Amino acid sequence: VIDAANESAAALVNLLAQDFSCFRDEHVFEGRRKPVRILKRAQILVADLWACFEGEGYGDFRDIDKITMFADYRVPQILNSMGCISYSPPLDTAIWMKRDIPSGSSWEMQLRGKAVSSQTARRRR
């Protein structure tokens, strides 16, 4: 799979998601036709390969900069505490009351999307 990606981090992320269901982190968001693809695990694997091999051999990716931040639940917590992102009042209440936020739910997708979006905007500055 690594060889098939032709030294492309983005291609390897997509191949991992295509060929291995455990890397297919995507959900339909509020009725949209195309799923939102976060692909956190696939991106972490690619970033780990790059780091472990110090950008050489199996870690030689010409587009490693295409990998986004890894959108899990911790990053939005930290960004919110720093004032970088805010939650809608209903979501803020649900978090404060420690309610479960199901995987693939609208709230989960909003949290993860906000985290990626805020860091992408920060990186462009």
Show where each model-derived region lies.
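HhH-family (HhH-GPD) DNA N-glycosylase catalytic core used in base-excision repair
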Residues: 1-125
